[in-house]
From Swiss-Prot:
Keywords: Aminoacyl-tRNA synthetase, ATP-binding, Cytoplasm, Ligase, Magnesium, Metal-binding, Nucleotide-binding, Protein biosynthesis. GO terms for biological process: phenylalanyl-tRNA aminoacylation. The lineage of its organism: Bacteria, Pseudomonadati, Pseudomonadota, Gammaproteobacteria, Legionellales. Its cofactor is Mg(2+). This is Phenylalanine--tRNA ligase alpha subunit. Belongs to the class-II aminoacyl-tRNA synthetase family. Phe-tRNA synthetase alpha subunit type 1 subfamily.
Length: 328
């Protein structure tokens, strides 16, 4: 019987050594150590041996059983370590490889400027108003003292729909609508997209504008100048040098255009138009110009963005080139 035990042990050693998976290893355990396994059958036959041999044979069977179990445990540990190493090798990160770049979105520079302008004017006590981009001729022109023969009302400068509908050429109509609703005194800005038939290095058919309006009983041109100086100083985060030039706008009188001095180029650059609200505009809204006065101003947000970010071509903001937009 000892020979049978030795042969069984050698067979088990070979089977365990050849096993390449935990599943096969479990099959070997059942084949040798299970209830109907080979070693279990030998153990049953010990009872048929002479009484004086039974203790020695029983001890030999148990030792072989223990040795086979140790072989199975050692092989199981080896297979688990091998499986783990293979998994780690597949997941291994080569730290010398160039990392992946995540393309993150960002706020458009025009939107940044718009948010900054809104924030600053809110701090100065202005309410923020919005209105429709598709307007009629009354709100876009007539209420603002722009007569029918004014050049701005021609097909060459304005985008018209059928009837008297058009794409607004400025955000001034918002001011008219708000004065109709709220009356006076009033202090507001209107931001949004406006449209004109123009395209070159400093103009686009669609651009962004902020217009401000103050109507009260003691509004003066000096108030207007002080407000614009304070706003532009805050926006550019430095003291800026302004120049007011006489100009003409149908809805303001007197009117002026405002230039900012550029020390780097030693030049003046126009940034906005402004003036005292024309008495006819007040009369159109049943406001007595002898009792109330006011001032208005209009600033191109795109022009402010050009100055703030030192961009030379306005069209770059609208070409959706991520190489350009990613700089802001």
């Amino acid at each position: 019987m000892q020979n049978q035990l030795n042969a069984l042990l050698q067979s088990a050693k070979k089977s365990v050594a050849d096993a390449q998976s935990e599943i096969v290893l479990e099959e070997i355990r059942v084949d040798y150590l299970g209830k109907k396994g080979k070693l279990t059958e030998l153990l049953k036959s010990v009872g048929q041996m002479p009484a004086d041999q039974r203790p020695l044979l029983g001890k030999a069977v148990n030792e072989i059983k223990r040795e086979i179990q140790q072989l199975l445990n050692a092989k199981s540990t080896q297979l688990r370590e091998k499986s783990l190493q293979e998994k780690l090798n597949k997941e291994k990160v080569d730290i010398t490889l160039r990392g992946r770049y995540d393309h993150l979105g960002a706020i458009h520079p025009i939107s940044r400027v718009s948010e900054r302008v809104s924030q600053l004017f809110s701090m100065l006590g202005f309410q923020i108003a919005e209105g429709p981009e598709i307007e009629n001729e009354y709100y876009n022109f007539e209420a603002l003292n722009i007569p029918a023969d004014h050049p701005a009302r021609t097909m060459a400068d304005t985008f018209y729909f059928s009837g008297d509908k058009l794409l607004r050429t400025h955000t001034s109509p918002v001011q008219i609508r708000e004065m109709e609703k709220q009356g006076v005194p009033i202090r507001l800005i209107a931001l949004g997209r406006v449209y004109r038939r123009d395209l070159d290095q400093t103009h686009t058919p669609m651009f962004h504008q902020v217009e401000g309006l103050v109507i009260d009983k003691r509004s003066t041109f000096a108030n207007l100048k002080g407000l614009l100086q304070q706003f532009l100083n805050c926006f550019f985060e430095k003291d800026v040098r302004l120049r007011f030039r006489p100009s003409y706008f149908p809805f303001t009188e007197p009117s002026a255009e405002v230039d900012i001095y550029q020390p780097r180029t030693d030049k003046w650059l126009e940034v906005l138009g402004c003036g005292m609200v024309h008495p006819n505009v007040l009369r159109n809204l049943n406001i007595d110009p002898d009792e109330y006065s006011g001032f208005a101003f209009g600033i191109g947000l795109d022009r402010l963005a050009m100055l703030r970010y030192e961009v030379t071509d306005l069209r770059l903001f609208f070409e959706n080139d991520l190489r350009f937009l990613g700089q802001f």
